[in-house]
């Protein structure tokens, strides 16, 4: 575990979200074309981050294994996680990061991800207080959920290639449910 002078670092990987109310925790992630939405309630002192690969839509069917790749699913999970920890929807504020065009020959999924996040937050009535999206380089992001402070570093060279590789990797498979049935 990597410790920073002022806190404990928790890494958020593709397809995950984290919600915390500990002022000593810093959430971090590495983004290429993926997008991370960072949200918090400044009054209750709870905040969190998600990291999604594709925008998705409420009409596109997603299996349980696929759902965590999509922004539409992870945005809802993050908001619900914040509300469960005492946040109020009317006080939520958000910052959006990522959405780079890391591979020139592919469609600009990063731009689509960022546009989705903006529209989703607008539709939900959540105020966007900061944004750093687009460009051609990946980012390393650090977010202090309780205070809302965010810091990013542009990734170049080997770090950028690692971010691109991470964006192309499928999200981890869901863990089997204990009550599931296994056929032989």
Curated annotation (Swiss-Prot):
Keyword check for Transport: no
Record protein name field: Probable chemoreceptor glutamine deamidase CheD
Single Gene Ontology BP annotation: chemotaxis
Family: Belongs to the CheD family.
InterPro entries for this protein: CheD-like_sf, Chemorcpt_Glu_NH3ase_CheD, Cytotoxic_necrot_fac-like_cat
EC number annotated for this UniProt entry: 3.5.1.44
SUPFAM superfamilies: CNF1/YfiH-like putative cysteine hydrolases
Top-level taxon of origin: Bacteria
EC primary class: hydrolase
Protein function: Probably deamidates glutamine residues to glutamate on methyl-accepting chemotaxis receptors (MCPs), playing an important role in chemotaxis.
UniProt-annotated stretches for the region Disordered: 165-184
GO molecular function: protein-glutamine glutaminase activity
Gene3D superfamilies according to UniProt: 3.30.1330.200
Catalytic activities: L-glutaminyl-[protein] + H2O = L-glutamyl-[protein] + NH4(+)
NCBIfam families linked to this entry: PRK13497.1
Keywords assigned by UniProt, alphabetized: Chemotaxis, Hydrolase
Pfam annotation, one family: CheD
């Amino acid at each position: 575990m990597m410790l920073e002078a002022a806190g404990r670092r928790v890494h958020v990987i593709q397809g995950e979200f984290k919600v915390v109310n500990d002022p000593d925790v810093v959430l971090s992630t590495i983004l290429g074309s993926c997008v991370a939405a960072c949200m918090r309630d400044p009054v209750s002192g709870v905040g969190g981050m998600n990291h999604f690969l594709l925008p998705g839509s409420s009409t596109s069917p997603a299996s349980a294994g696929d759902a965590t790749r999509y922004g539409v699913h992870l945005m809802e999970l993050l908001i619900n996680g914040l509300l469960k920890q005492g946040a109020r929807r009317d006080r939520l504020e958000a910052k959006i990061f990522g959405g780079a065009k890391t591979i020139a020959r592919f469609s600009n999924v990063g731009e689509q991800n960022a546009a989705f996040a903006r529209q989703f937050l607008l539709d939900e009535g959540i105020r966007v207080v900061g944004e750093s999206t687009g460009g051609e380089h990946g980012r390393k992001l650090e977010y202090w959920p309780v205070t809302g402070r965010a810091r990013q570093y542009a990734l170049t060279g080997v770090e950028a290639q690692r971010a691109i590789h991470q964006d192309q990797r499928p999200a981890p498979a869901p863990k089997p449910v204990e009550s599931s049935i296994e056929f032989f």
